[in-house]
Amino acid sequence: MKNKLVIALGATIMLVSACHKTEDPAPVTTDFNTMKEQVLIDFTNKVAVPGYKDLADASDNLYSTLQTLNDNPTEDNLAAARTSWKNMRTIWEQCEGFLFGPVEDNDYDPNMDTWPTDYVQMDSLLNSSNNLEVSDIQAATLSLRGYHPIEYIIFGNHGDRKAADITTRQKKYMISLATDLKGTCHDLYQSWTADPVNFAKQVITAGNGSAKYAKKQEAYLAIVESMIDICDEVGGGKMKEPFDTRDPQMVESPYSGNSLADFKNNLVGLRNVYIGKYKEDGLGINDLVSSKNVALDNKLQTQMTAAINSFDNITVFYEDAIINQRVQSQNTMNALNELKQTLEGELKPFIIQYITD
């Protein structure tokens, strides 16, 4: 990210641009007390805020490509819109590695990413007399809002939608959805970077005047709990629910065939949080862990890599895999469960033991 992100935190805290950080990296420290402050700073400035900035920018780009498709419904413009949608999903799914704070408190997550969707319900809305204005979308059932109705309109079933077949009503719905989604993403970014919430400041000053976290430990536990939650959501929800029911309609992102990429990026986002890296390196929780317990750090990183790589063994759409590649699917869920158990049973107690202030 090239533009500067500046968060006012008084005379003691100053952010510099990513470019400057690359040219003049901060000196590495092995002092635990210093590291536990720097890890919160780097998580905020190098993972969370840049991720949400990229998400807001991606929402602008998606809106632009959908507007172009609306004005000129060619196959090339449809392909560009699909690419923009998938690119935005990559960013968002990685941001789901830290679903705490405003994204949860203000319902930004369900407002833009509720699943499963019901194409019958969407078709019913499209065939109704609803005006499909942005305000109508915001008042609708959550499953009729956000990424997945856009996905349904531009992909159809696994990409069989033709640009010329997108109806006037679908275009109206699509643009209102994109407008609403764009607003949500910008609100989410602003909630981290601007008053009155300025959640970045609340994380960085945890235990030192934060209005949200009286102790650093509270901020760390919120971060670790979000890692546990996304691990459980993917393995115990996104994958397991359609797997157990053998119901393809329960799968997230089914119209685009993007489900496995979504799941994998959730775990990439979890690892980003742990190692303090998104586009550039920072100090991460791994540095704290390895300074006290090298074996635990090795175990966590090995399990994260194994879980991420396991998705590559599923070689068909996940809605097909729940029928035809059940062993591979179960192996991935097992890997996710093992990681979750280590996060919950070993990393969380580590935080409680070593970060007490």
Model-derived regions: residue spans:
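Mature extracytoplasmic or organellar-lumen-exposed domains after removal of signal/transit peptides
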Residues: A26-D357
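Bacterial Sec-dependent N-terminal signal peptides
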Residues: K2-V39, D357
